[in-house]
Amino acid sequence: MANKFVITWDNMQMYTRQLAEQLLPADQWKGILAVSRGGLVPAAILARELNIRHVDTVCISSYDHDHQRDMTVVKAMEGDGEGFIIIDDLVDSGDTAVKLREMYPKGKLVTVCAKPAGVHLVDAYVVDIPQDTWIEQPWDMAVTYVDPIAKK
């Protein structure tokens, strides 16, 4: 993927707060199920904004930094997801979302970002991303010193 969409920490907080507004009223939720690892940061923000204390994880491995690979369920929460917000950072091809729907058919599946191939699988999201675009998440980047242009 040649195109990149960079999400800063500030943007992630802003987008996730917008997502939280779509999930009101907060008292309808028993808890949040974060899809590890991409959903961990958004889950923390949702937990704060919706004042939800019960946060669990489902660990599904399908990416290795910049490419997809076989999906493995490492850890799962018991139950059908009823009353839970299931949060991931992104729905891309939809493979992870399909698995989550199978595991938690009564949960509310939400993502911060959505690509066209998987957008129909989520109940709510905030940012549309073109299919051929790679997302750089803030936890995958570091702030580094850059020489002034005049020194180059």
Curated annotation (Swiss-Prot):
Positions contributing to 5-phospho-alpha-D-ribose 1-diphosphate binding: 37-38, 69, 88-96
Q: What domain of life does the native source organism fall in?
A: Bacteria
* Required co-factors: Mg(2+)
Binding of xanthine occurs at 92, 135
The protein's topology relative to the membrane is: Peripheral membrane protein
Which coarse location class describes where this protein primarily resides?
membrane
Where is Mg(2+) annotated to bind? 89
- Report the HAMAP family cross-referenced here: XGPRT
Protein name listed in UniProt: Xanthine-guanine phosphoribosyltransferase
Give the source lineage, highest ranks first: Bacteria, Pseudomonadati, Pseudomonadota, Gammaproteobacteria, Vibrionales
Originating gene: gpt
